[in-house]
From Swiss-Prot:
It is found in: Cell membrane. Zn(2+) binds at C36, C39, C61, C64. It catalyses: Typically cleaves a -Gly-|-Phe- bond to release an N-terminal, basic peptide of 5-8 residues from type IV prepilin, and then N-methylates the new N-terminal amino group, the methyl donor being S-adenosyl-L-methionine. This is Prepilin leader peptidase/N-methyltransferase. Zinc is required for the N-terminal methylation of the mature pilin, but not for signal peptide cleavage. The gene is comC. It comes from Bacillus subtilis (strain 168).
Length: 248
């Protein structure tokens, strides 16, 4: 099963990266077919094979020789690994469906935020019915836990945005509402903590290495995605570990 999830993740990861690059530009995610961003030549089926095509072509376009962004194979590999991690965590269970849908959403919004500093409403709206169906299939502790989580996620980020005078974007606020719906209040708090920690560490490293100016805006969705997935898959284990450490 893990190999199937991994391969499935490779294929969808390629599609998710393309979708994340096209949706903010109001382009179709289906047509035209993928092409080289430099010479605009339509890629052949062999050039669309996840990971392998990048390796065989040595990271370059066969036609014009320009280097292909490493983000393409990175998105494929990250999605594949996360799908497999969900399979390891939940096995063949009802919770595997919301896990795959949730990871898919977070991969796409991470891509849009990296490239455009934007989390389009249409992506969140598209995924809402699937996440709602997923929570009907595999509910949280109570039927209202998801609604409480959504309200908590929205209000908490909205308050932070008001205090920081726009330090948090509207897309981040709505994304956290969706995350709260999926995770519930308890894991939402863990997701927020992990997200802030990851974002702070990345931001500090980027400033120290000169990749980011001190006051330059930083896309927060990738950190939110990483922190939320960490909380979703391993939050209970991490919390239990620290409680045991605190109690000696």
């Amino acid at each position: 099963m893990l190999s199937i999830l991994f391969i499935f993740g490779l294929i969808l990861g390629s599609f998710y990266y393309t979708a994340g690059c096209r949706i903010p530009l109001h382009l179709s995610i289906i047509a035209p077919r993928s092409s080289c961003p430099f010479c605009r030549r339509t890629l052949t089926p062999a050039e669309l094979i996840p990971i392998l095509s990048f390796l065989f072509q040595k990271g370059k376009c066969k036609s014009c020789g320009h280097r292909i962004s490493f983000m393409y194979p990175a998105a494929e590999l990250v999605t594949a690994c996360l799908f497999a991690a969900a399979g390891i965590r939940f096995g063949i269970s009802l919770e595997l469906f919301p896990a795959v849908v949730f990871i898919s959403l977070l991969i796409i919004v991470a891509v849009t935020d990296i490239h455009f500093m934007l989390i389009p409403n249409r992506i969140l709206i598209f995924f809402l019915p699937f996440l709602a169906a997923a929570r009907l299939i595999s509910p949280l502790d109570s039927w209202y836990a998801g609604l409480l989580g959504a309200a908590a996620g929205f209000l908490f980020l909205a308050v932070i945005a008001a205090i920081t005078h726009g330090g948090v974007g509207g897309g981040d606020i709505k994304l956290f509402a969706v995350i709260g719906f999926v995770l519930g209040v308890k894991m939402l708090a863990a997701a927020f903590f992990f997200s802030v920690l990851i974002g702070a560490l990345y931001g500090a490293a980027a400033v120290l290495t000169g990749r980011l100016a001190k006051r330059q805006p930083l896309p927060f969705a990738p950190a939110i995605a990483a922190g939320s997935i960490l909380a979703y898959l391993y939050g209970d284990s991490i919390i239990s570990f620290y409680i045991k450490m605190a109690l000696g």
